[in-house]
Swiss-Prot record:
Subcellular location: Cytoplasm
InterPro entries, A to Z: Tscrpt_reg_Crl (IPR009986), Tscrpt_reg_Crl_sf (IPR038208)
Cellular component aspect of the GO annotation: cytoplasm
GO biological process: positive regulation of DNA-templated transcription
Organism this protein belongs to: Vibrio cholerae serotype O1 (strain ATCC 39315 / El Tor Inaba N16961)
Gene, per the UniProt record: crl
Protein name stated in the entry: Sigma factor-binding protein Crl
Annotated keywords: Activator, Cytoplasm, Transcription, Transcription regulation
């Protein structure tokens, strides 16, 4: 590990992941486990904002020594504030895939440069472009 790279404690990781953008669900994170999500596309934008559901993705990031495992899921974010795994309609797929792929690139780069940690995608992960 280089002199500039700090030991990846939970709080250093949390601070770094939080700085990456709005996707981290900080209140649902714990030691060695981090939850992210993205509301990429509105299910029905004709509804008033408080009644909207969204298509998107969520990801569970688990720390194992000098490696992180990312498990992505795709689906619908409900009015109740829960994710439901289901197929994304074709009209929303491009936006969901784009946000997921761009976030993953940024995650890999950030963890590699800041902590020399690699990120692997879990075999149970939903595929993305």
């Amino acid at each position: 590990m280089s002199e500039m790279t700090k030991t990846p404690t939970h709080y250093r990781l949390l601070s770094t992941l939080k700085a990456m953008g709005p996707y981290l669900r900080e209140g649902q994170c714990s030691e060695r486990f981090y939850l992210f999500d993205c509301l990429a596309s509105c299910v029905n934008d004709k509804k008033s904002p408080e009644k909207r559901e969204f298509w998107g993705w969520w990801m569970e990031l688990t720390q194992n020594e000098q490696e992180m495992s990312a498990c992505y899921h795709i689906g619908r974010y409900t009015l109740a504030g829960d994710w439901v795994a289901e197929a994304i309609p074709e009209s929303a797929q491009a936006e969901v895939n784009h946000t997921q792929a761009e976030f993953h690139k940024k995650l890999v780069k950030t963890l590699r440069e800041r902590f020399e940690i690699s990120v692997t995608v879990s075999t149970e992960s939903a595929p993305f472009a």
